[in-house]
Amino acid sequence: MNERTNVGYKIIKVVALPHVEFVLGEKTTDSGTKYVTWRCNNHTDYYYGHYIENFDAAMLDLYERVQDEVIFIISQLKEKTK
């Protein structure tokens, strides 16, 4: 797979769910390394970015976003089975 980037951020982590991905981007500049997590559709449509200064905080944000989405998916499935 080709290296993915968005607005100068290299995508370094991808968590794919059935209809959406959450990604972690990294960008190194003269002032240091910056991180962002995005929601992503179709490997190219990045939105709802959370911009973060620290790698560990960015990883936590990524996994919290994934967790929130999984909880939402589960609630939708439970509603369908009622």
What name fits each language-model region?
Residues S75-K82:
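Short acidic DE-rich linear segments
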Residues V20-G49, R65:
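Short aromatic-glycine-(Arg/Gly/Cys) micro-motifs in beta-strand/loop hairpins
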Residues Y51-V70:
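A short, charged, amphipathic alpha-helix used as a generic interaction element across diverse proteins
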Residues K13, D45-Y47, I71:
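Generic detector of short alpha-helix boundary/capping microenvironments
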Residues N6-Y9, V23, Y35, D61:
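General helical secondary-structure elements
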Residues M1-A16:
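Negatively charged, low-complexity tracts enriched in Asp/Glu with abundant Ser/Thr
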